[in-house]
Amino acid sequence: MTDPIADYLTRLRNAIQAKHRVVEVPASNLKKEITKILFEKGYILNYKFVEDGPQGTIKVALKYDSVNKVNAIKKLERVSSPGLRRYTGYKDMPRVINGLGLAIISTSKGVMTNKEAAELKIGGEVLCYVY
């Protein structure tokens, strides 16, 4: 697999389209950090790391509106890819839907949102947009 983050986002998108409640994805440290951010910002209901074998899996419980059955995640968009890395400085942090969405940034201080990176005045690689 050449791009594990794109695979992770695609698995989430496919589960949302199929209205699944839970999706299992292969674990990695970067995927764990992205999942934590999605949980903290309220885009997913819950998550659990399952240690089975050398890699393990992440069980992600997707969040749906109880009335309309609409998912909290409208779009997951991969920005940086192995073939074309996208970096940004703290002064040029992307605003996703005028601040309503978020960009997930990989920095020297770890994985964080675009707002957190701008507050700490550090740039990094723009992994994806979530809204």
Name these PLM-found stretches.
Residues 1-131:
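Core subunits and conserved enzymes of cellular information-processing
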